[in-house]
Every structure is written in structure tokens, then in C-alpha cells.
């Protein structure tokens, strides 16, 4: 054991579980199960499990893209890696993390010696304590950890029960007494029902021996998470273990740790100056015409200096009025191409009261991915609940009875780790918020349920009679008119328009493009809404600072009375600013909007991109396409038709010529000869 006063007793007098190797496994998870509060549980992060030595330096790591608390890989660090910069016993106290295995290598015996080798690989092992500083010592360590009478054992650290105070601390590798071990590879097979990990060898002794002879790390461990370890929520504070070798004499040991780090896959949005009130864009003024340059006369040849034209600047962002008009204009274009009879004369009104957007449940074909795609990192959190969704569509998960009216088809997720990605132009509306991607692991672990929806702005449709009636002076009370929203008129355009485009051709394709323009206008409006809320939050923070300054002044004035609270005879009068939650949510919303914009642009094909880049390209193609097609048909079939026509004329002419020639001659009658 770790204490020099604790010596090994005969096997018939003590519990054989008394011999353990100290291994400290520090499993620190950056963020407990409540990490990233308010985010979608299906959001994918870049997760990295790092194994550290006793000094908390990373010596081994593995990374992957998964939702939080769904990825528990097997950790396979080498035992000697954990000893880097560790206790002097292992011979690696001066080796930095991620260092290559130190030499010299062992000799190859009868097959020949290697340059710089120290000892024969086939030499019988002595009773020297195994170390990691040479290939021969690592071979000795391999045989010690694999033999039936040897091995190693692991003792838990800070998360052990309080009654196990006799197990000691890091100086004894948490194995100061027998009975503290919970896992390892020893002949008594230590185990536990509450510990968070199990540790074993990852290679057989024959496999490890050959790797050791090649002067490499040859003692990999296999660390697996138990069911208890996958359920704990205290990884942020870290958990430690100790590992000790089971050898004769004092058991050597070491300490190491494992921590989990995660980071968002989305882009980092820069934060710049943001005014309290967004400026409204005025109508652009026409650019003044450039003054004509005077031509140099023959008598005056002084050269004139021509100032270079200013470099083109990026157009300013659209103001509030322009954004709202873009929403209405996009709604009109989409409605005009899908239902042209309804746009002969109508009024489209943008609703100014919340909710500003509504969802339409649709049926669509989602894609199944075994690995997390890029759009799974865009975790949207718009204030869209299932109560604001209409229609019937595709549902996934355990849908409660109160929301089953939204489901036309309900699917159950199977077991396994895979991802369900919504089609382009749609989102999954879950009870935890909007998300473009679902994790089957999260759905199976929780009671989450989702509906496939389209997102539409709240634009109402009115016939002209409704608007005219508002200005007529009538004393008759009319019935409340029925308002049709854009979602009811165009619901399902994303899935229906794309499917119809395959069979109907150009019309459906243009309709889909108009929907994409409306979708882009919706994204721009959501960005401006986010900026407006951010401005409001900053204004509230500024007001809070003024309030706190006034409060401090009042406390000084009422200092003799015991402060402002005592003067007002109030028990407590503290001020708490909760705008930090708003600031965090707005930063996440800004990041998700940027990610969704990139995903929308990347989903467009090269053919659609040509129409979007050049506004005059569509008009040019539609104008010259007809004449070009006619000219192409003439060039393809014209020579054949012309040859047929010429041959027909030649045949008719030859017939006429034959008739003319036959009219100029008469048939001679045969002469009869009389016999003489």
C-alpha cells in the first residue's frame, strides 16, 4: 500500500483485496447535466475527453461531435502516459506530456541486436520493480499487470462514501487500507455497484510484448463508464481515483485525471457598437451627376487632375420599414405565383401584435445520419411553442394527448445513436424549442417530442371589400370578417413546392424560389428583432446603473437612520438585475441565426445560385429562351424538312413532264398483211 508501515500479510490472514495500485482518475466535466442552460438538448457540441496526469496536464484525449451526456467512449490511455511528470518511481518525472517513449530499446536476442539496445528482450525478468523509462522496463511492467498473481487495483477519490475515511488521500493514492478498491485487474476481481468507472488492460500480454520490443507505449488501459457514472451530475467539480500495482513489497502508484470539455460548433459572432435605438433608413437621395471635365484648348495645355472614383461601399442594413415591406412583398410574390387568382385585388396586412410567426405542421422526408451533420450545431430557441402550430404533420417521440391533434403520422425512434435532420425550409418544433436536428439518444432518454413545421410570418389576407367597408359610413353592424393568414394560404409550400417542381417543371421551381425569398426576408426580420431586444436590454442595464447610483446616495443620506431600508421600515430592499439572462439568450439567438443563414445558403444548388446572384439573369433567360429554342429546332429539323420538300417538288415536276411528252405522240396501229 501507499503507507510504508502497511506491509503485506500472508494470503490466509488478510483479505486478498488488500493489494491495489493507485490510479487517480479525475473526471471533470465542463458543465453538469444542466450545462448550457436553456439550449436545446439535441444541439451537437464538439466534445473532448482529456486524460490528465497527477499535475492535471493533458496526456491523452479523444474528440467527437455529439449532444451533451450522450457520448461515453472507452478511454485507452497508456499506463506510462499517466506517469509523465509523475512520481519518481516510474522514471518519467522529467518527461513532458505527449512525449515519445524513452529508450533505449531492448535487444532482440538471437535474431540480432539493435543499435543502442540495453538488455536482451528475452532475458528472464528479475524482481526489480517495473518502471517506464526503458523498453525492457515497460516489458517488465506488461508482465506484472497481466500475470495472475499480480495486476493492479483502483480506488475512488472524492466521490467515495463518507464512511471510507480510512482510504486516505492523494499521497496514498486513495488506497491506504484494504477494501477501498472498486475496480482493476487482480485475482480477487475488485468491483463496485456505485463507482463511476471500470479499469482493465486493453491488450493481451502477447500483443503488448511485441509492442514493447518495438520501443513504444505498450501498456494501454481500457477505462469504461458505468451506468452510475453516466447518471451523475457533479462532473464539474471533478472525480479522482488512485491506481496501484500489486507487487511484492510496497505497491507503487500514480494519480491521473479525466476531464470533459465541450464547445459550440457554431460560428463566433463578433460584437460591435450597437446604438440604443436602431436608426431608420431614409429614402436614398439620387447621386449628383458628375461635372463634365473641360477639354484642354490648344492655347492652354495645362493637364487637368481627375479625382479617382470612390471605392464601392457595402450597402447599409435595411431599416425597420424596409424589413417589414420586404416581408409583405415576399408574401405577395409567393402568393401571386401559387394562387394568382387571389392577388387580382387584395390587401396583405402584417400583424403588429405577438405572435409574429406561426408554424404549420407538414409531412416530409427527413434524413438519417449516423454522425452529427453540420446543421446539428445550430440550436434555435425561438419563442414558438406547440400551441402556436396549426395543421397536421409528422411527429416523433411520445406526443401527449393534448397535442396529438397536430400529428398526421407519429414515428417512434429506435435504439442507437443517430441524428434526424429536417428537410430544407423546415424545422423540428419540440417541447424544448426549435431545432434543425434531432438526436435519437436524447429522444430515447427523455420525454421530448417534436413536430415537423414550416415557419411563416403573421401576414393576414383580406379581400378588397373588407378594406372598402372600413371607409364606408354605414349604420348597419356587419359580421366580423374572417381573416386568412399566409400560413393557411401557403402552408406546405416547402414540401409541396419542391415535390411539384419535379413533375410540373418551371412554374413550381419559380414558386419555390419565391418561397426562398420570403424565407430570407423572415431571417432578416428575426435578426433585427434580436438586435432590438439587445438594444432594449442595454437600455434597461443603463437605467439599472442609474437606479443603483441613486440608491447609494439615499443610503448615505439616511445613514443615521440605518440606511434606506430602515427609513422605509422595510425588511429587505435589494435590487436584482436579471438582464444577464436576456444577454445570454440574445447572444445564442444571434449565433443560431447566423448558422441558419449559412445552412440555407449551402442548401441551394448551383442552378438556383445563378438566379439569386443576378437579378437581371431571370428576365434575360425568359426573354431569349423562346427565340433560342425556335432557332435550335430550325437548325435541327430544317435540313430534313427542306430535303423532303425539294424531293416532293422534283417528283411532281417529273410527272408533269411525262404527261407533256405523251401528248405529242400517238400510238400506231399495227398493219395487217393480206396473203398473196
Curated annotation (Swiss-Prot):
Keywords: Cleavage on pair of basic residues, Coiled coil, Disulfide bond, Fusion of virus membrane with host cell membrane, Fusion of virus membrane with host membrane, Glycoprotein, Host cell membrane, Host membrane, Host-virus interaction, Lipoprotein, Membrane, Metal-binding, Palmitate, Signal, Transmembrane, Transmembrane helix, Viral attachment to host cell, Viral envelope protein, Viral penetration into host cytoplasm, Virion, Virus entry into host cell, Zinc
Positions of region (Immunosuppression): 548-564
GO cellular component: host cell plasma membrane; membrane; viral envelope; virion membrane
Comp. bias regions, Low complexity: 294-308
Signal peptide limits: 1-34
Protein name as it appears in the record: Envelope glycoprotein
Superkingdom of the source species: Viruses
UniProt-annotated glycosylation sites, renumbered to this chain: 46, 202, 336, 368, 375, 408, 444
